[in-house]
């Protein structure tokens, strides 16, 4: 398993790069499920709910009755498969959260046994505390699974107080996740790209400057 984070300013192409990677993953017969954080952040775990609900539509047989009881609070669509599923009672919120996190891990692991799985969560700069905690948990628990956890976030929106900040800061030294920073193209980069595209090493500086400032 692997975790990769794409970071960069708004509009730099994080989602586009991820989309191209997902196309390649599908061509390699990987399962691909996508979730997006919302600016409102009014639904806890929203991107996971979105992605796992989609996964359930394609792989209903990967959920056991026991797992359904743990996941039903997060993925209500499970009731379509297990109408009797009810969340397991718990007087300890931390233990309940840990059971939920492990249930998500188990579900992803079961899904990946058939085919490798890519879980892409976009706009993580809008992640709530619960979502950030679950993302961190999954990233730490998938090394032995055939799962790629792919995320994208706006670097300038992740301050010290952001719920994902600690994970982003500590994940690379701990070798938990590889962050790929996307930067704007320099004037030199644009020139090199134009010359390659036009197959002309003599494209003039004014032309390159015009395109650089336009884009």
Pin down the residues of each PLM region.
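Key residue(s) within conserved catalytic/signature motifs
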Residues: 1-215
């Amino acid at each position: 398993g692997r975790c990769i984070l794409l970071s960069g300013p708004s509009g730099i192409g994080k989602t586009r790069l991820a989309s191209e990677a997902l196309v390649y993953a599908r061509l390699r017969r990987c399962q691909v499920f996508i979730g997006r954080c919302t600016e409102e952040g009014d639904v806890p775990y929203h991107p996971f709910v979105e992605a796992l609900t989609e996964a359930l539509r394609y792989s209903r047989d990967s959920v056991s009755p026991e797992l359904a009881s743990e996941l039903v609070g997060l993925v209500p669509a499970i009731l379509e498969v297990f109408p009797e599923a009810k969340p397991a009672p718990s007087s300890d919120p931390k233990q309940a959260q840990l059971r939920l996190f492990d249930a998500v891990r188990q579900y992803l692991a079961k899904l990946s046994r058939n085919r490798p799985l890519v879980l892409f969560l976009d706009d993580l700069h809008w992640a709530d505390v619960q979502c950030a905690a679950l993302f961190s948990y999954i990233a730490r628990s998938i090394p032995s699974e055939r799962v790629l956890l792919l995320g994208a976030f706006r670097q300038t929106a992740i301050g010290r107080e952001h719920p994902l900040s600690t994970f982003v800061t500590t994940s690379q030294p701990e070798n938990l996740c590889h962050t790929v920073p996307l930067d704007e193209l320099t004037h030199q980069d644009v020139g090199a790209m134009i010359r390659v595209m036009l197959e002309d090493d003599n494209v003039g500086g004014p032309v390159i400057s015009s395109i650089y400032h336009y884009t």
